[in-house]
């Protein structure tokens, strides 16, 4: 039996350090730790793909948390089945569960379904909040870019920089920068 590790964060700005440290504490060799810095909703992850190629029957894959392996219940079930068909067990360190045995597989399936439901609830609440804010007039996203042609046109008509700034709802310094360019 060989131990392998898998760690994932959703973005390249996040750190894998905590997960890798936990895997090493379980005696997983650094050369057997596979990582990804992409969303768990992406099924074709490079680190996961490499892990699938390396493991053999009797091996065990350690993952710090259930949601690090995947986000979607159907994808998680498919991954677990794929590893199970290869004779490879998955153990989730923080959750204290394993795919070894029928009960372990059932628990993992239920927990991944609960995790997915929670994510959907969070998305729902976020969207409701966004719609409510929008109804109250809250603006989202970047401010519109400055229409430089309009700044030059108004300036050509003899309108002051302060008045141009008011009309176009931009800073006076922005007007000066456009005129200087």
UniProtKB/Swiss-Prot annotation:
One Pfam family cited in the UniProt record for this chain: HTH_7
Entry keyword set: DNA integration, DNA recombination, DNA-binding, Plasmid
Resolvase/invertase-type recombinase catalytic domain residues: 2-137
Keyword Hydrolase recorded: no
MF GO annotations: DNA binding; DNA strand exchange activity
Biological-process GO terms, alphabetical: DNA integration
UniProt-listed InterPro entries: Homeodomain-like_sf, Recombinase_CS, Resolv_N, Resolvase-like_N_sf, Resolvase_HTH_dom, SSR_resolvase
DNA-binding region: 161-180
Statement: the UniProt record of this protein carries the keyword Zinc: no
Annotated active site: 10 (o-(5'-phospho-dna)-serine intermediate)
Similarity field: Belongs to the site-specific recombinase resolvase family.
Its biological purpose: Site-specific recombination protein.
Name listed for the protein in its UniProt record: Resolvase/recombinase
Organism listed in the record: Pseudomonas putida
